[in-house]
UniProtKB/Swiss-Prot annotation:
This is Small ribosomal subunit protein uS2. The lineage of its organism: Bacteria, Bacillati, Actinomycetota, Actinomycetes, Mycobacteriales. Gene3D superfamilies: Glucose-6-phosphate isomerase like protein, domain 1, Helix hairpin bin. Pfam families: Ribosomal_S2 (PF00318). GO terms for biological process: translation. The keyword Ribosomal protein applies.
Length: 276
């Protein structure tokens, strides 16, 4: 069973790319057409690549790995934090600090400092200090919490990273590639597919698109955790609320995909939807 449907992708606007003047020519193979100066991403390919990424994440986690969720742009911050937290994975949804991966030993020391300050605050360690000292320690704790709170329990570099917007997160992607850490990411029409190991062609600017695809990756993590625990295979299909009706041309895309599918709910991997 497919982990996400064409209808869910269309409802979330995953098929909308950037304006035709803002694109990376390397993305040409993932583009279906353009409409009103906007590139339309081939969602048949998106479905196929989602399956590949889902399987990789599930197997990685099932074998004891961790996935770091990265999305610092406003449209991704909430879903990245919520989905990573849901499955107990680390995340970065504020500013990426250079060296978070390549200089993790230093980052780990800052995490230890954060936990030390939290323990002091909770056990009365601030008592007996001047107001100025308490204010300084509180500010230090809050700053560390903002920048490192999402990775507080990350004891080592992750097995893979999930990225929303590889252009904005180019430092994170570069560090992962330098360390040989696989990158799973949304590829919008202005991105470079050569930087990503497991690409998912799609819209990385729309809140609902970023949320849907992040939820898919989190569901893969959840299924991997179930397998690791010996709980058997779970249903990783994300639940998406009904959206407003599709435009006529979007309905044609959906109809083409349905006709091409070998079975209900399956992913067609060889047929490109036809625009009417």
């Amino acid at each position: 069973m497919a982990v996400v449907t064409m209808k869910q992708l269309l409802d979330s606007g995953t098929h909308f790319g950037h304006q035709t003047r803002r694109w990376n020519p390397k993305m040409k193979r993932f583009i279906f057409t353009d409409r009103n100066g906007i590139y339309i991403i081939d969602l048949q390919q998106t479905l196929t690549f989602i399956d590949k990424a889902y399987e990789f994440v599930k197997e990685t986690v099932a074998h004891g790995g961790t996935v770091l969720f990265v999305g610092t742009k406003k449209q991704a911050q909430e879903s990245v934090a919520a989905e990573a937290t849901r499955v107990g994975m680390p995340y970065v949804n504020q500013r990426w600090l250079g060296g978070m991966l390549t200089n993790f030993s230093t980052v780990h020391k800052r995490l230890q400092r954060l936990k030390e300050l939290e323990a002091m605050e909770q056990t009365g360690g601030f008592e007996g200090r001047s107001k100025k000292e308490i204010l300084g320690l509180t500010r230090e704790k809050n700053k560390l919490e903002r920048s490192l709170g999402g990775i507080r329990d990350m004891a080592k570099v992750p097995s893979a990273i999930w990225v929303v917007d590889t252009n904005k997160e180019h430092i994170a992607v570069g560090e992962a590639r330098k360390l040989g850490i696989p990158v799973i990411a949304i590829l919008d029409t202005n991105c470079d597919p050569d930087e990503v190991d497991y690409p998912i062609p799609g819209n990385d600017d729309a809140i609902r698109s970023a949320a849907l695809l992040t939820k898919v990756i989190a569901s893969a993590v959840a299924e991997g955790l179930q397998a690791r625990a010996g709980a058997g295979r779970g249903d990783g299909k994300p639940v998406v609320e009904a959206a407003e009706p599709l435009a006529e041309w979007e309905q044609e895309l959906l109809a083409g995909a349905t006709a091409a599918a070998p079975a209900e709910g399956a992913v067609a991997t060889e047929t490109t939807p036809t625009e009417g």
